[in-house]
């Protein structure tokens, strides 16, 4: 999975945690 802070797109499930919609980056926790 992608590390925290990595740019992500809405609807993607590639983050280790989840994607922040307002910043389009993976959450830290």
From Swiss-Prot:
Might you report a single GO cellular component term? host cell presynaptic membrane
In terms of PROSITE patterns, this protein maps to: OMEGA_CONOTOXIN
Tissue specificity remark: Expressed by the venom duct.
Q: Which residues does this entry mark as bearing 4-hydroxyproline?
A: 4, 7
> Where is it chiefly localized?
secreted
Disulfide linkages recorded for this protein, renumbered to the chain, are 1-16, 8-19, 15-26
Q: Where in the cell is it found?
A: Secreted
One MF term in GO for this entry? Answer: toxin activity
Keywords, ordered alphabetically: Calcium channel impairing toxin, Disulfide bond, Hydroxylation, Ion channel impairing toxin, Knottin, Neurotoxin, Presynaptic neurotoxin, Secreted, Toxin, Voltage-gated calcium channel impairing toxin
Q: Specify the superkingdom.
A: Eukaryota
Something else known: The sequence shown is that of conotoxin GVIIA.
Q: What is known of its domains?
A: The presence of a 'disulfide through disulfide knot' structurally defines this protein as a knottin.
> Know the name of this protein?
Omega-conotoxins GVIIA/GVIIB
């Amino acid at each position: 999975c992608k590390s925290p802070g990595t740019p992500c797109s809405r609807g993607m499930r590639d983050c280790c945690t989840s994607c922040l919609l307002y910043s389009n980056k993976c959450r830290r926790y």
